[in-house]
Amino acid sequence: MFERCLYFNVNALARAVNRIWDEAFSEFELSPSHAYLLRLVLTSPGLTPKQISHELKLEKSTITRFLTVLEKKGLIRRRKGISSDAREQAIYPTRKAEKISADLEEKGDELYQKMIGSIGKNSMTSLVSQIRDIEKNI
């Protein structure tokens, strides 16, 4: 019945992937979204919420909520940015975040390998590429 339905099939895949990612990042007491935001900040310290929003393709208000959670956990700190806009902040990882950085990256690599093991490297590469192309074009 739903073999042609993009909405149904993309969401079914997202739920299945979310279950795997939720379990994987639970050891850090982070949701996958929080973990990926933190990984971005660890890789590129000093990004603004607007830049993070653009990179993660999430609304700025969502990023603000995620940053509040990470700040309460002691994983990020906000500093006044170099912009003329006093409201714009730069986001930096804390030492606590830096201590788990390698473990977060390792977990990301494990998940990638798990997906390759499930669907194969060519299928994985093709699927991610197609999803990114579709997202740009709709």
Regions found by a protein language model. Name each.
Residues 18, 68-129:
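Charged, amphipathic alpha-helical coiled-coil/dimerization segments
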Residues 55:
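Residues within the alpha-helical elements of helix-turn-helix
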Residues 1-28:
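N-terminal leader segment of winged-helix/HTH proteins
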Residues 23, 69, 133:
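Alpha-helical DNA-recognition elements
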Residues 37-38:
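Short alpha-helical "packing" element that flanks the helix-turn-helix/winged-helix DNA-binding module
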Residues 49-50, 61, 68, 89:
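Residues within helix-turn-helix
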Residues 44-48:
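Short capping segments at the starts of secondary-structure elements
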